[in-house]
Curated annotation (Swiss-Prot):
Homodimer. The gene is proS. PANTHER family: BIFUNCTIONAL GLUTAMATE_PROLINE--TRNA LIGASE, PROLYL-TRNA SYNTHETASE. Pfam families: HGTP_anticodon, ProRS-C_1, tRNA-synt_2b. This is Proline--tRNA ligase. It comes from Chlorobium luteolum (strain DSM 273 / BCRC 81028 / 2530) (Pelodictyon luteolum). Catalyzes the attachment of proline to tRNA(Pro) in a two-step reaction: proline is first activated by ATP to form Pro-AMP and then transferred to the acceptor end of tRNA(Pro). It is found in: Cytoplasm. Belongs to the class-II aminoacyl-tRNA synthetase family. ProS type 3 subfamily. One of its GO terms (molecular function) is ATP binding.
């Protein structure tokens, strides 16, 4: 029930944990750093998977599956990659009761094991491109964990593609980061900033990393997806060459891209409130709960509720009836608000006499009278569509209201405690690191969106807020998850 949840303005971190556990989305495991994704949470992941998988296939990708274990010799082939991931790796040293001749790494990501296969599959330009996605689990030995946001084991998808030219691979990188952007905005109702990472923030072994960054309700940033241009680094590490159209030998050009169950954490923190989960309808496996008010002729009320659910389901709206009598209607209202069911419909004997029912939106708690009968599915769909749109607009307005421009370091330090800060940066890793050390804020993204660039004049030269040196552009700073 909602009274288990700490208020956001009292303790935001505790609010998040309380909500995740009270709404039965996930729980702690007896295995250190790991979580149990409960059915309510996994249902959200399934909706995300279904939408993303369709989008991947529409852009020409196919699914495959590669081993969980990676030989140590494979990991060591890409020096920058192993340097980036070694501290987070789990390593298998024994199997079948004996010490292994070669250690096996439990995948933190799959570039190395996949490129060992690509080397066997690619001989000619005719074998390219390869556009493969994998749905899998990965392990990164995290010291400080938080449900969905940072766990030792998590679920994700990782795309790995191989191309004949650098132009093709860059097109793929941008195509996929835009797929993620579309998914975040159209399904999650979560506005994001799309752009590049700085060299110090990019993926280990990548030439460039592109990302989408979202603002949570506490003003912090959350990286919601990444797409990496790997250049020829992994092809060279695995000696993956192909014969070009003009009969030359060249190394293959590569990309990788991924999102994870971290998106569920983003969804929770972007939209939910002190009553519980607020889910955008497109990611709700159950969009409507019908609660019959069981007074008078209970059988007639239940019959009406079942007929309403059937008509909604026939129209493609997932609906269910809670006709149980062990809990009061008030208890049910609070419970389904906690679980984030987008629309609640109440119907009782008097409503049936009037030919109406009462619908309540989860996001605004606004109630409206709807006519019973054949117009009901259309009216409910209108509410769901409005809710999806309004949740995005509310989150966008919140981001805009909590994004400020800073022209001095003092302004910056005050503003970065509350949200995103747009400021000039001199382009050096030294300045970036100093700001991070002193404020815990990082450069989240160098925006690539025309609208965002124009709104905040991101390409306008100026003076670095920290060093006072000339700066060619502004960047987005924030504290982050």
């Amino acid at each position: 029930m909602a009274d288990k949840i700490t208020a956001r303005n009292e303790d935001y971190s505790q609010w998040y944990i309380d909500l995740v556990r009270s709404a039965k989305l996930a729980d702690y495991s007896d295995v250190r750093g790991c979580m149990v994704i409960r059915p309510n949470g996994y249902a959200i992941w399934e909706k995300m998977q279904a939408a993303l998988d369709r989008m991947f296939k529409e852009t020409g990708h196919v699914n495959a599956y590669f081993p969980l274990f990676i030989p140590e010799s494979f990991i060591a082939k890409e020096a920058e990659h192993i340097e980036g991931f070694a501290p987070e790796c789990a390593v298998v040293t024994h199997g079948g009761g004996e010490e292994l001749a070669e250690k096996l790494y439990v995948r933190p990501t799959s570039e190395t094991i996949i490129w060992s296969s690509y080397k066997k599959w690619i001989q000619s330009y005719r074998d390219l491109p390869i556009l493969i996605n994998q749905w899998a689990n990965v392990v990164r030995w995290e010291m400080r964990t938080r449900l969905f946001l940072r766990t030792t084991e998590f679920l994700w998808q990782e795309g790995h593609t191989a191309h004949a030219t650098p132009e093709e691979s860059q097109e793929e990188v941008m195509r996929m980061i835009n797929v993620y952007r579309t998914f975040a905005e159209e399904y999650m109702a979560m506005p994001v900033i799309m752009g590049r990472k700085t060299d110090s923030e990019k993926f280990a072994g990548a030439e460039e990393t592109y990302c989408i960054e979202a603002m949570m309700q506490d003003g912090k940033a959350l990286q919601a997806g990444t797409s990496h241009n790997l250049g020829q680094n992994f092809a060279k590490a695995f000696d993956c060459q192909f014969q070009t159209k003009d009969s030359r030998l060249d190394y293959v050009w590569a990309t990788s891209w991924g999102v994870s169950t971290r998106l569920i954490g983003a969804l929770i923190m972007a939209h939910s409130d002190d009553r519980g989960l607020v889910l955008p309808p497109k990611l709700a496996s159950r969009q409507v709960v019908i609660i019959p008010i069981l007074r008078g002729d209970k059988a007639a009320v239940l019959e009406q509720a079942d007929a309403m659910a059937a008509s909604l389901k026939a129209a493609g709206i997932p609906a269910f009836v809670d006709g149980s009598e062990q809990n009061s209607p008030g208890w049910k209202f609070a419970e389904y608000e906690l679980q984030g069911i987008p629309v609640r419909i109440e119907v009782g004997p008097r409503d049936i006499e009037k030919g109406i029912c009462i619908a309540a939106r989860r996001d605004t708690l606004e109630k409206s009278e709807l006519q019973l009968g054949e117009t009901l599915p259309g009216a409910v769909q209108e509410i769901l569509d409005a809710m999806q749109k309004d949740m995005y607009q509310k989150a966008l307005l919140f981001r805009e209201e909590n994004t400020v421009e800073a022209s001095s370091y003092e302004e910056f330090k005050a503003a970065v405690e509350k949200g995103f800060v747009i400021a000039h940066w001199d382009g050096t890793a030294e300045t970036e690191e100093k700001i991070k050390e002193e404020t815990k804020a990082t450069i989240r993204v160098l925006p690539e969106e025309d609208g965002y660039i124009e709104r905040y004049r991101m390409n306008e030269p100026g003076t670095c807020i920290y060093s006072g040196k000339p700066a060619a552009q502004k960047v987005v700073f924030a504290k982050a998850y």
